[in-house]
């Protein structure tokens, strides 16, 4: 494998000359994956923010699609929710009203987190995937906790207690799952590629 290939996203290597149609399909599939994973959700009794599978899907899309496709997929996901499609986690406000609710900060941070994760994976060694994923998680929690503090008129410790600390164990599991998927995906891709392209 060439040195340049190590700085490309998984999809860039899989589709080195992706057409416009292929890129559109990838972006749509990324938004669909996030929407499907969002349906896996439950609420904790002491927080207005649900535990969902959204962030797992975001991390997977960000780590494999590259910065621009990942950000576009998450922007499309937010647009789908804004017009009323049932893509957000169940139980919250519908449509645009969701962006005035307790989870708005997390949602609005999604495209930035996806872009950052994609940007880092395009530039860092694959062994540095943990750093890239943690940076994306930090962006999500920064947006989410900051908005929750304002929305619920909480102190910073209260906002962290409701919007950060309860979710750390679950998000650690998501990081581990993404970390398990990435090496396996790269290994499978490299097994398929001719030796002369490596």
Indicate where each model-derived feature is located.
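Short helix-perturbing small/polar motifs within transmembrane alpha-helices
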Residues: 2-15, 22, 36, 94-142, ...
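Alpha-helical transmembrane segments in multi-pass membrane proteins
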Residues: 26-37, 58, 62, 73-81, ...
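Structural signal for the C-terminal ends of transmembrane alpha-helices
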Residues: 64-68, 116-124, 184-190
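Alpha-helical membrane segments and adjacent membrane-interface helices in multi-pass membrane proteins
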Residues: 41-116
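Hydrophobic transmembrane alpha-helices
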Residues: 2-73
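Peri-membrane helix termini and adjoining interfacial loops of integral membrane proteins
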Residues: 2-8, 82-90, 152-158
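Membrane-embedded alpha-helical hairpins and interfacial helices in multi-pass inner-membrane proteins
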Residues: 124-197
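Juxtamembrane/transmembrane-helix boundary motifs in multi-pass membrane proteins
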Residues: 14-18, 22, 46, 89, ...
């Amino acid at each position: 494998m060439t040195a340049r290939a190590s700085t490309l996203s998984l999809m860039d290597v899989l589709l080195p000359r992706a057409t416009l149609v292929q890129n559109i399909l990838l972006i749509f599939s990324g938004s669909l994956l996030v929407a499907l994973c969002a349906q896996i959700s439950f609420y904790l009794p002491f927080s207005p923010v649900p535990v969902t599978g959204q962030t797992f899907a975001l991390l997977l899309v960000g780590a494999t699609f590259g910065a621009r496709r990942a950000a576009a997929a998450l922007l499309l996901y937010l647009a789908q929710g804004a017009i009323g499609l049932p893509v957000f986690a169940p139980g919250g406000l519908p449509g645009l009203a969701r962006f005035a609710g307790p989870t708005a900060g997390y949602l609005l941070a999604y495209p930035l987190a996806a872009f950052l994760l994609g940007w880092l994976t395009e530039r860092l060694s694959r062994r540095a995937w943990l750093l890239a994923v943690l940076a994306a998680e930090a962006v999500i929690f920064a947006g989410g906790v900051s908005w929750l503090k304002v929305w619920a008129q909480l102190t910073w410790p209260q906002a962290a207690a409701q919007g950060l600390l309860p979710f750390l164990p679950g998000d650690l599991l998501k990081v581990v799952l993404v970390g398990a998927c990435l090496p396996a995906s790269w290994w499978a891709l490299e097994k398929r590629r001719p030796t002369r392209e490596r």
